[in-house]
């Protein structure tokens, strides 16, 4: 009798642990979010003193436009901050927003949201797409340049500086996001 009670207790404990499988949360795990790339692209690049531009196939005209705009935006923001950018900015251009969503680079948890004209940033890499509107494209470029510049001013230009200053300097995200938004758009009734 004692032995059968012991077996029953062991079986109940094991069955209790197995029943937790019904609360599996694997579909909400953040790893493994690969995106399907529908086409193979032939990438090219331009190298400039302060930035590099990576583009593909029919994006040559867009890359030329980005080069002119980035020079203007960067010099304007450097003058405004009285600070010269030390690291090169890496611009990656996609011809459409759908093509930018095919990329695994800069894969963020809130990937289903619309970027709304703001550039995605990963380190000093700025990912932009052209939606046919030069005003939106300029806004993405200025936003990307502003974010890279602000991050370099606050955290430094070397990885060791970023780690050291990231532990010491802790600005709230709303401050940095607000500053970058202010720098990337002129004040108007729409932005207020």
Annotated model-derived regions:
Residues 11, 61, 189-191:
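Amphipathic, positively biased hydrophobic alpha-helical segments used for protein targeting
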Residues 1-27:
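Bacterial Sec-dependent N-terminal signal peptides
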Residues 21-172:
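Juxtacatalytic substrate-recognition/specificity segment
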Residues 182-192:
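Short helix/loop segments within enzyme catalytic domains
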